[in-house]
Amino acid sequence: MAEMTVELVAVERRLWSGSATLVSAQTTEGEIGVMPGHEPVLGQLVEGGVVAITTADGERIVAAVHGGFLSVTAKTVTILAESADLAEDIDVEAAKAVLAESGDDLEAIAVAKGRVRAVERA
């Protein structure tokens, strides 16, 4: 099966890099699925979104992302997020607590919702 190079990077660190067969992400234009050979595109990631990567060996990598961009060429996908957390590293109970206690803090709510969704999709 055809493969592409994918990098998932947050401002403070690289979360994952490798070969993949599929990337799906939530953008401001809607959800996008990218396979090898996709037309070039640049998309803006939603606040509190989820990115899912199917690796070349069939593993599924899921991350909560908060803002940033998705850049696609025929052979590469780069996800540059303002902040991101792999689903396996998320404390879902802490995220739910933030949702319960955040009041009017819309940014905290968006980040917490993205974290909960990432764990649910993993």
Curated annotation (Swiss-Prot):
UniProt similarity note: Belongs to the ATPase epsilon chain family.
Compartments, as annotated in UniProt: Cell membrane
Membrane topology: Peripheral membrane protein
Cellular component terms per the entry's GO annotation: plasma membrane; proton-transporting ATP synthase complex
The protein's role, per its UniProt record: Produces ATP from ADP in the presence of a proton gradient across the membrane.
Protein name, as recorded: ATP synthase epsilon chain
Keywords for the protein's UniProt record, in alphabetical order: ATP synthesis, Cell membrane, CF(1), Hydrogen ion transport, Ion transport, Membrane, Transport
GO terms assigned for molecular function: ATP binding; proton-transporting ATP synthase activity, rotational mechanism
SUBUNIT field: F-type ATPases have 2 components, CF(1) - the catalytic core - and CF(0) - the membrane proton channel. CF(1) has five subunits: alpha(3), beta(3), gamma(1), delta(1), epsilon(1). CF(0) has three main subunits: a, b and c.
